[in-house]
Amino acid sequence: MFHRDENVKLWLVSHKSLDTCTQATHTHTCPDCVIPHILNGEANCIISNHSASSSLHSKGYVIVVEVEGDKRSHEVKLFVFGDSYVDTGNSVNSASYKPPSGDTFPGKPAGRFSDGCVLTDYIASYLKIKSPTPYIFRNSSELQYGMNFAHGGSGIFNTSVDGPNMTVQIDSFENLIKEKVYTKADLESSVALVNAAGNDYATFLLRQHGSIQDMPVFTTILIRQMSLNLRRIHSLGINKIAVGLLEPIGCMPLLTVASSYEKCLEPFNLISQNHSQMLLQIVQELNKELGKPVFVTLDLYNSFLSVISTMQKRHSENPTLMNPLQPCCEGVSMEYSCGSVDEKGEKKYCLCKKPELSFFWEGVHLSQNGWYAVYMMLYSSLSKL
């Protein structure tokens, strides 16, 4: 997905002033759909086991159902590769470690590009394990739940952000195996989560001055490398690998601001659609070649669109509910973004009154509620892991 850096502002066609937005405050409590449980002494995102659909629907939540999660033993480990949609702490110098990130969970900035839990947390919760340790903390934290190598702003190839691309992330994983941090048995019972490509497209269009017309060739290059990456992760010993399809990048508030958050930009969504179709085909071919369903796709593209459509319908029926294309957190004017402060340390951003009803946290990343809604759309696919 697109990383928040200053160059990305070149994507904007126009931007109306946000000086009139109010800087609302909210308490540091998790919404009803997610409860931060204590696991081995630390707070962790665990799906609640109660059904509260009626009350939450009245509050504007997208979907809430009772969730049982995976029934396998706690021996399972989760290894994560990709960008900020799945990063839980590796981007130490980023906005993920600055307010208001983490306001909902755990109540302070903790390395997630959201107000709370992200996709990695929910998949770990499904597996009934703690979210895996970020790679930068590999020498000081528990390793029994796996490792998160994902880094905000990274891509399949190098991007405009100084961070490890996916090849380097897999290199780090391989080194841990060589150091016998994880055994063959560890890996055989484990799951990998792979999600990347949005930052590659942003870099291609911005740094390399590419155009949408040039996309088909670039997409082919990305898919070819992703195929190599997936093969490599499997060859290192992991037998179940979840692969995220590309989210509809034309629906990001960073772009929808051009239409006053009224509609997604279809030319950009077409990029995502083509990428996802090609990636799905590659995954199917790999599974056929291996003779078993090693790879499972997580359809972020259609999950995002489904949730957005549902929330837009409810917003049209009840304007007091939040427009899903509008971010919860945004800068007070064009030169600022979520988390910006001036030279005096004063906030130059505003927050929505109810983050628990939002879909996007800021211009690129989802809120905790947004990720929960997407997770529920993906839930049936997780049973294949």
Regions found by a protein language model. Give the residues of each.
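Mobile gating loops/cap/lid regions near enzyme active sites that modulate substrate access
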Residues: 95, 248-266, 285-288, 292-364
